[in-house]
Regions:
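Mid-domain alpha/beta scaffold segments of enzyme catalytic cores
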Residues: 1-208
Length: 208
């Protein structure tokens, strides 16, 4: 049984743990042998001059996703700049055929507008989803997948599980990924093995 962590900022001590480590384009990038990474421009660090560096790093063979990218109304950067950088990363993900891992805070309308306008081909995964079930349904209907950590709403978790578009993550938490799986499996009334199998299948499908 493999417990996939689709989004973390903490490289796993055991390289046999399948985890996608998220690195901002402003941070040093020193990939470990065998590691998997996502590289992007976070809306908290929005700056157009980071796009060339992002493009260079995104082509690295150990970078399997783009992000985290997205929109955040609590960030200092103007929303217009955030949208510009987000759209650039959407296009980059499509160009490189890599999934996009998304950070979104209070900007769901803008996020869906970008998706409708650009009509991307690459999979989109909203990380750390904490919204309610109606928002989850809206995002799922638009073709997105949702990733959950320890903090979430049970109704949205169930909605996403029923649609088979659920991923699991630790984000920046020190909690072991196995405990996150145990928590989510318990709320869904399924075995950890069943949840792990579903997430593994979904994760593998991202790249085929």
């Amino acid at each position: 049984m493999r417990l996939y962590d689709v989004h973390t900022h903490r490289p796993p001590a055991d390289l046999t743990t399948p985890a996608v480590v998220s690195i901002d384009a402003s941070e040093p990038f020193e990939p470990r042998p065998g590691g998997c990474y996502a590289v992007g421009i976070h809306p908290w660090h929005a700056a157009a001059d980071r796009l060339p560096l992002l493009r260079l790093r995104a082509a690295h063979p150990q970078v399997v996703m783009i992000g985290e990218a997205g929109l955040d109304r609590l960030a200092e950067a103007p929303m217009s700049l955030q949208i510009e950088l987000f759209e650039a990363q959407v296009r980059l993900a499509d160009e490189l055929r890599k999934p996009l891992i998304i950070h979104c805070v209070r900007a769901w309308g803008e996020l869906l507008d970008v998706r409708k306008r650009l009509r991307p081909d690459s999979p989109w995964i909203v990380h750390g989803f904490r919204g309610k079930s109606p928002l989850a349904t809206q995002l799922l209907d638009a073709g997105l997948s949702l990733s959950f950590g320890l903090l979430h709403r049970p109704d949205a978790l169930r909605t996403t599980w029923d649609r088979r578009r659920l991923f699991v993550e630790t984000d920046d938490s020190p909690t072991p990924i196995v405990e996150v799986y145990e928590c989510i499996a318990g709320e869904l009334h399924v075995s950890v093995e069943s949840l792990a199998h579903d997430v593994e299948k979904r994760f593998t499908a991202l790249f085929h």
